Regions:
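S-adenosyl-L-methionine-dependent methyltransferase catalytic core, i.e., the SAM/SAH-binding region
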Residues: 1-139
Length: 139
């Protein structure tokens, strides 16, 4: 397992697991992997044939990946979920989790440009490879 860094503490973790009603042989997607808290809990409930695909467009999340054969990290925006699932040969899923919003990780990193606490460039991109940052949008 990759070393987990302090990134984000998942909110409503137990409620999310109850809502997903995870089947041991099910296929699940976490479209906002981030720190991996929700995904780690999903994997705990999967049997040998269960699968979890976790997406994030922020490559910082890759450092939190889970070293488990039932887990696949997908670098991308969940707007392309259908394309990614087709790529991996997934015909249907049993549940999708989306923990939308900004994590503490983004506010605590002055280079990300999400916080008013730091002097810095107004970036605010979840995907640092995106063409335009927030400063460009408001200019």
């Amino acid at each position: 397992m990759a070393e987990q860094v302090t990134y984000h503490i998942p909110a409503l973790l137990n409620e999310c697991m109850t809502g997903l009603d995870i089947k041991p042989d099910g296929t699940y997607v976490d479209v906002t992997f981030g720190g991996g808290g929700h995904s780690r809990e999903i994997v705990k409930h999967l049997g040998e044939s269960g699968r979890l695909y976790s997406m994030d467009q922020d490559m910082d999340a890759y450092a939190n990946r889970i070293d488990d054969s039932r887990f696949t990290f997908v670098h991308g925006n969940f707007a392309f979920l259908k394309n990614f699932m087709r790529y991996y040969g997934v015909e249907g899923v049993d549940g999708v989790l989306a923990d939308l919003g900004v994590s503490f990780h983004h506010f605590d990193d002055s280079e990300r440009g999400f916080s008013f606490r730091f002097n810095g460039h107004l970036d605010m991109r979840m995907n640092r490879n995106a063409k335009h940052d927030a400063a460009w949008v408001i200019a």
